[in-house]
Amino acid sequence: MLLTELLTPDQVVMPVVARDKSGVIAELTRHLANRWGCDYAEVLGAVQEREAGGSTGIGFGVAIPHARSAGVPELSLVCGVSPSPVPFDSIDGEPVRLFFLIVGPPASAGQHVKVLGRIAKLVRHEPVRRRLFEAATPSEFYNVLLDAEAR
């Protein structure tokens, strides 16, 4: 599954305004809940519970908070870019500027794992990360992903 099949430019939050980990998770979850008409509190609780089990900061300035929740009808993705680094307890100890929030219903476990892997594979490449960090608009961010996935 391609990320661009789950994402549209209106699902890219730019700029992320929260300055701490819990605030970023809440901000992105609010965007997801508003976009799909989900129960914000239920989805936020699921994401926070997953994050409490271990940080989803994967290094290189990237975090992939994720959860499964009956509060969402289908696998959903919201991305965000912060103008300044946010402390996130990442595995490399570095703060984060690039966020990918994935939430899906319990039955979407297989797709969920594939999307996690797809994101990790794409952001491992420094040129892709740099272009995502430098994207000036949600459309530009989306087009960077589109281009990266076409390769």
List PLM regions with ranges.
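Cytosolic covalent-transfer regions centered on His/Cys nucleophiles
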Residues: 1-151
